[in-house]
Structure formats: C-alpha cells, structure tokens
Amino acid sequence: LGLASLSATLAFALAVPLAWWARMSHAARLVVLAVAALGLALPGPVVGLAIIELMNDPRLPVLNWLYDHTIVPPLLALVVRGLPVALLVLWFAVFSLPWQLFELAQLDGVSQWAQLRRIVLPLRWPAMTAGWLAAFALAMGDLSTSILVLPPGVETIALRLFERLHYGAEDQVAGVSLALWLGFGLIGAVAVGMLTRQARTTKPRRPAARAAT
C-alpha cells in the first residue's frame, strides 16, 4: 500500500502541471498527448527492462546504488505506469472548466500558474481525487512492470498473489483476491462518484424563466 500510495502521489504531482501546461498552446497539447499515449502503449515488461538498463549503467554508480538498496526502481516503474491514466483524468478536469474564468483571471492580472492554484485546484478537486485513485489502483494491481525491478525483501500485493498462486495456496489466493476485488470496487465507485459530481457541476445552468407580465 505504501509503494502504491507514493507512486500515485508522484504520478499525480507530475500530471497536474502537465495537464495545465497542455491548455496553454496547441504544441503543448500534442506533447502531453504523446506522453500519455506512449505511457499507455508501452508494455509493462518493456518499462521494467528499460529501468534495469538505465540503473545498471556503469558510468552512473549512484544509480547502481539506488537500484540495489532502495525502492526507487519499482517506484519509478509504477509512476511511469500510473502517469498516463492520471494525466487523462486531469486533462478532463482542466479542459472542462469554462474558458471565461481564465479570461477574467487574466484581466485581473493573475498569472497562469496562479490560476491553476486559485481556480483549477479548488473547483476540480473531485476529479483530481479520481485521478489519484486511478493511479493508485493501477499501482496496486501492477505485476508485469514491478516484478522485474523489485529489490529483495520488498513485496507488493500483486506479487504476493502471484507467488501464492504459483505454490498452490488456493485459500490464501482466494482471500487476497476477494480483498482486492472489494478494494478495487470501492476505489472505482469513489472515482466514478467524484467524476459524476464533477460533471454535474460542469453543466451550464439554464437561466430562470421570467415571470409573465
């Protein structure tokens, strides 16, 4: 849980400025979409092998030490996997706001990044929460990427389930699977609820009908 929470937080911290930067220009939107598409398209084992190759570079002994003694490799792998999902959710959060709000803020002299802090974050926190939950759920269930880079002594829930399945511990597999099913169901329900609430607040309200004279 700790590794999944930390990776989701880092992915969220990267996704927020990227989604906000995407609205500033057409070129920025293309770059951010390319980042999201690449992250979604890359298979998990490819990401894991790329991290192994990077952190075993003999020219960078610091990376070698981090690879052998820290959780940086699996953390980096889970951030790469979770970033595209969080980015797409936050894209919706940013681009669903009325553009008039930002025009008024610019007229008042509010900078671009101050608009993110004062407008987007307070108004779009439900979608922001849904983005974090999506990255967290993906990190919780990841096996294909993290299994290649986990250091000795570190075990994720997905890896534990895989090992119990391999050794035939069916009762433990059933218990862990049920817990994961309930947990993912709760996360999905909360995320859908957050996005539904956000969509309702985004819909323009009809002007009240005038009383007949």
Question: Which role fits each region the language model picked out?
Answer:
Residues 16-54, 102, 208-213:
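Cytoplasmic-entry segments and transmembrane alpha-helices of multi-pass inner-membrane transporters
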Residues 26-32, 45-81, 113, 149-153:
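Membrane-interfacial helix termini and adjacent extracytoplasmic/periplasmic loops
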Residues 13-18, 49, 73, 80-101, ...:
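Membrane-embedded alpha-helices of multi-pass transport/permease systems
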Residues 21-22, 26, 91-106, 110-118, ...:
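C-terminal transmembrane helix and the adjacent membrane-cytosol boundary/short C-terminal tail
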Residues 1-24:
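Transmembrane alpha-helix signature in integral membrane proteins
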